[in-house]
From Swiss-Prot:
It is a multi-pass membrane protein. InterPro entries: Srf1 (IPR037737). The lineage of its organism: Eukaryota, Fungi, Dikarya, Ascomycota, Saccharomycotina. One of its GO terms (biological process) is lipid catabolic process. It is found in: Membrane. This is Regulator of phospholipase D SRF1. Residues 289-308, 370-403 are extracellular.
Length: 437
């Protein structure tokens, strides 16, 4: 009992001593302020206050209260430990991010007089903190990583997907391309191992672009997984390059047969000539039929209709073209190959195709002009008095004229294709002979 009484007396003496020191410090500050005011009144300006020497008395015991500019708040113990403030700060930061850590201390554990708003502004710069406590060391490694490798890999992936933000996103095409794997539709797998690797690659692409990633990007597990993201993206790019090379290899396998078909196959050029001859025969028949209908008296106009240039030119050009097609088809299929004959004579013969291309183009232009001629039977214009300008409209002749224009257009296209392939064949043979010599 004696010891307890003595400790209580010592505690009361210490408390009274501290209270007296605080009162003395307040009185000291008041005296200093009064002396400053008197100095300003005597001099009449604030500049004299800077040069004036203010006498500040000191306590004799050398306590912190001897220094008037020392903040006494530093020596008052805080009621909330610093680690509680750090935990509450982490909880507030995670709430802003959309996630809450279960290990964060709840508000119920705090004292009633604790107000979060008063301490939130002092976290990290409180006078009771040391220099090493101004940041949370538990997140040091995560923050350092997020500013270096994870951010760079994430930005690289976003730049690859969203290269141009001004262009269209094309999400439907991307989804169709991944889910239906159009690249794999044209691939032929030699072994089951290649098919298995292709399916694994497709699954990785689906998981990368369309996976259900609902984890918190700021959580420790998510940050730890980001370490492998860069390597995983590199592996995915390697597999993508592998399948791109496989597709290129498949295309290279089809290229030699296609080249041989265009340059060496005699049946290809023969088929093109026959098809062009059929179109020329049909065009010639339509032109002759239009010519006959125009010369005969009809019940609508009760007179003969004047002939148009397209009809006469179609008859002349197609009649000569049929004879030329028969001759050159026989020469190319049954004659000597280009390598065993004079290339110049063969080239002169093929250049006649260019002559028919020119006349067919002119004939096509005249056919369209005849179809929309206001003074012919396909377009009739009525005057205000009810009479027609030019010939009345005759549907049966107009239908034949439209068909003639269509067949002339297709025939012109076939002339151009046949001429191009023939020229390429002659040039390729001549260049190969020159290289051998």
């Amino acid at each position: 009992m004696g010891d307890s009484n003595s400790s209580q007396e010592a505690y009361s003496d210490t408390t009274s001593t501290n209270a007296s020191r605080i009162a003395d410090q307040n009185q000291l500050n008041l005296n200093v302020d009064l002396e400053k005011n008197q100095t300003v009144r005597k001099s009449g300006s604030l500049e004299a206050l800077q040069n004036a020497k203010i006498h500040v008395p000191k306590h004799s015991d050398g306590s912190p209260l001897d220094y008037p500019k020392l903040n006494t708040y530093t020596f008052v113990p805080t009621t909330v430990p610093p680690y509680v403030l750090e935990a509450q700060f982490d909880k507030l930061r995670l709430q802003d991010k959309g996630t809450v850590d279960g290990n964060v201390t709840d508000d119920k554990n705090l004292p009633k007089e604790f107000k979060w708003g008063q301490f939130a502004s002092t976290i990290g710069c409180h006078s009771a903190y040391t220099r090493d406590q101004n940041y949370n060391p538990s997140h040091k490694s995560y923050d350092g990583y997020s500013l270096s490798s994870s951010t760079s890999s994430k930005n690289a992936a976003l730049r690859e997907i969203l290269g141009d933000m001004c262009s269209e996103w094309g999400g439907e095409e991307r989804l169709e391309g991944v889910l239906h794997s159009e690249i794999g539709a044209n691939l032929e797998f030699n072994t089951t191992e290649e098919r298995k690797e292709w399916l694994q690659y497709i699954e990785k692409v689906k998981d990368f672009y369309y996976g259900d990633n609902k984890k918190n990007p700021e959580s420790p597990e998510s940050v730890h997984n980001k370490v492998y993201k860069s390597d995983w993206v590199n592996e995915l790019n390697k597999e993508r390059e592998k399948w791109r090379r496989l597709k290129q290899r498949k295309l290279q396998q089809w290229r030699p047969p296609l080249t041989s078909l265009l340059l060496d196959n005699q049946y290809l050029i023969l088929g093109l000539r026959i098809f062009t001859g059929i179109l020329s025969c049909i065009s010639l028949a339509l032109a002759i039929k239009i010519f006959q209908n125009s010369r005969s008296n009809n019940t609508i106009s009760e007179s003969k209709i004047g002939q148009q240039p397209s009809t006469i030119m179609a008859i002349c050009v197609n009649a000569v073209a049929i004879a030329y097609i028969i001759y050159i088809a026989h020469d190319e299929f049954a004659g000597k190959p280009v390598g065993l004959r004079n290339p110049l004579s063969k080239l002169k013969l093929i250049l006649l195709d260019l002559l028919f291309i020119i006349f067919s183009s002119a004939n096509l232009a005249l056919a369209f002009n005849t179809r929309f001629d206001k003074e012919w039977v396909c377009t009739s214009i009525r005057r205000s008095n009810g009479s027609t300008y030019g010939y009345p409209k005759i549907p049966r002749i107009c239908r034949k004229q439209e068909a003639l224009s269509a067949f002339l257009f297709v025939a012109l296209f076939m002339w151009v294709i046949t001429f191009s392939i023939s020229i390429v064949r002659v040039v390729e043979k001549v260049s190969s002979i020159t290289n051998r010599n």
